[in-house]
Amino acid sequence: AIKWTCDGSPEFTIEEVDKADRGSDIILYIDDDCKEFLEEARVSELLKKYCSFLPVPIAFGKKKEWKDGKQVETTEDNIINDTTPLWTRKPSELSDEDYKSFYTKLYPMSDEPLFWIHLNVDYPFHLTGILYFPKVKSNIELNKNKIQLYCNQVYVTDSVEGIVPDFLTLLHGVIDSPDIPLNVSRSYLQSDSNVKKISTYITKKVSDRLQSIFKNDRKQF
């Protein structure tokens, strides 16, 4: 096996070692000012935020169960993520209840959405996602930053200005695309050709859905 070692500087060492079992072991050493990342609750919080929909299973400790009035660990791995979230599946496989349940999972304290749009395009850019029209009772509930941006099912941010048009940022839901550049300024983002195409596509899908409801269900509209 190969052992890679680094102390945090640009330099590192690589050496051959004996290893009895298959797989990779990653050992991290935490500085004193970062000890919060050794706390189970903190690690669980970060995994839940960024890795809830990672495409590979993540085991974090063992499952627990109540026994004799207290929680005890079992021998079963505690898988903390959903590897096939709704937006990665075909709309034909999903029911209205599936969409509503997923919305409740994302926004536990919200009322059921009015309706939703399932996004799925592979060319000329890759984009998947689900956008929900929330039930809004007052202006106070018109909160932005409710659309979550993912890249290959890894959470990135809930600030999608420059990607989703401003007049649509009141929607809720998820968009996932590996074609959106990360860690760049908003002005650069708005000038990116793929981002422009994605923004136009989302606007058209929302417009088409609203137009369809207007024609076929005027009362709901």
Locate the predicted segments by residue:
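GHKL-type ATPase core
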Residues: A1-G69, N78-I79, C151-V154
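Short acidic (Asp/Glu) and glycine-rich catalytic loops that position anionic groups and cofactors
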Residues: K3-C6, G23-Y29, D77-T84, K146-N152, ...
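Cytosolic catalytic headpiece
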Residues: R22, S101-F102, Q211
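Short loop/turn segments at secondary-structure transitions that flank enzyme active sites
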Residues: D32, K137-N139, P181
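GHKL/Histidine-kinase-like ATPase module
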Residues: A41, G69-I175
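Extended, well-ordered alpha-helical scaffold/bundle regions in very large, multi-domain proteins
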Residues: L182-Q220
